[in-house]
From Swiss-Prot:
Its EC number is 3.6.-.-, 2.7.11.1. This is EKC/KEOPS complex subunit BUD32. This protein is considered an atypical serine/threonine kinase, because it lacks the conventional structural elements necessary for the substrate recognition as well as a lysine residue that in all other serine/threonine kinases participates in the catalytic event. BUD32 has protein kinase activity in vitro, but in the context of the EKC/KEOPS complex, the catalytic subunit KAE1 switches the activity of BUD32 from kinase into ATPase. It catalyses: L-seryl-[protein] + ATP = O-phospho-L-seryl-[protein] + ADP + H(+); L-threonyl-[protein] + ATP = O-phospho-L-threonyl-[protein] + ADP + H(+). Its main location: cytoplasm. GO terms for molecular function: ATP binding; hydrolase activity; protein serine kinase activity; protein serine/threonine kinase activity. Keywords: Activator, ATP-binding, Chromosome, Cytoplasm, Hydrolase, Kinase, Nucleotide-binding, Nucleus, Phosphoprotein, Serine/threonine-protein kinase, Telomere, Transcription, Transcription regulation, Transferase, tRNA processing. Gene3D superfamilies: Phosphorylase Kinase, domain 1, Transferase(Phosphotransferase) domain 1. GO terms for biological process: tRNA processing; tRNA threonylcarbamoyladenosine metabolic process. Disulfide bonds: none annotated.
Length: 263
């Protein structure tokens, strides 16, 4: 991560808020901080509480006016989407804490933890690697079904993620189980199109195949089992929507295979 990005976020924040960078993508940099963005100075919300700061730095290759407009639009769009998703009963997404669209900043609650024995952070990808010695256990099965239910809830309410990889599904411990949370809605949208929902499912399927190929067929079947259960709970109309969506998902999958063959 460049010193320039670190300096730019330091100029935006006040009071020398401590930040630890954890990831950097094409559009944004993600930090953790023990300091709440708008509680009184030097006060934290719990001794071990962490927060997420997602920061969209300035893009030097864009005209400054265009860059500021895009940053404001995308930051506001993601924040509004998260706020709406939080209203859906049963859907697990991070709580929005604060938004500064003019500087490209979104503050969120921190979710997840370090997995035991050095298996890394508790996203779905690392969780499946951690359980590779017992890939078909009840714990893995139930977790994958719950992942499917979360995606089903999102799609039933006509929201799409846009980048549904195993790294963008965080697992939070709930007793002996793990509850999946969908994160990073930078490419998220409101959409009634089965094409957009089919692409979400295809992206996740490919992500699972690419990192857990030996067990991917079973994992993806469990995801679809949970996904289907959400639509089935809405009766005949829900089942009809599910069939339309899966039909399009299979078309998206076929197109993806053709592209892979052609290169």
């Amino acid at each position: 991560m460049s010193a320039e990005i670190i300096a730019s976020i330091a100029d935006v924040l006040t009071d020398n808020i401590p930040l630890t960078p954890i990831s950097q993508g094409a559009e944004a940099v993600v930090f953790t901080s023990p300091v709440h963005p708008y509680l009184p100075k030097n006060r934290t919300d719990g001794d071990d509480k962490l927060y997420i700061l997602k920061y969209r730095p300035e893009k030097k290759y864009r005209h400054p006016v265009i860059d500021k407009t895009l940053t404001k639009h995308r930051t506001l769009g993601e924040s509004r989407l998260l706020a709406k998703l939080r209203l859906i009963d049963g859907l697990n997404v991070p709580k929005l804490i604060g938004c500064d669209p003019y500087h490209g900043c979104i503050w969120l609650e921190f979710l997840g933890e370090d997995l035991p024995n050095g298996h890394g952070f508790s996203n779905l990808k690392n969780f499946l690697w951690m359980n590779a010695s017992d890939p078909y256990s009840d714990l893995v099965r139930d977790t994958m079904i719950n992942v499917g239910k979360q995606i089903g809830l999102m799609h039933w309410n006509d929201y799409c993620h846009g980048d549904l990889t195993t790294s963008n599904i965080v697992l939070v411990r709930a007793g002996e189980d793990w509850q999946p949370y969908l994160i990073d809605f930078g490419l998220g949208s409101i959409s009634t199109l089965v094409e957009d929902k089919g692409v979400d499912l295809y992206v996740l399927e490919r992500a699972i195949i690419s990192t857990h190929s030996s067990f991917a067929n079973r994992y993806n079947l469990w995801v679809l089992e949970g996904f289907k259960s959400v639509f089935e709970s809405h009766g005949k109309a829900g089942l009809g929507k599910y069939k339309d969506l899966i039909r399009r998902f299979e078309e998206v999958r076929l197109r993806g295979r053709k592209r892979s063959m052609i290169g």
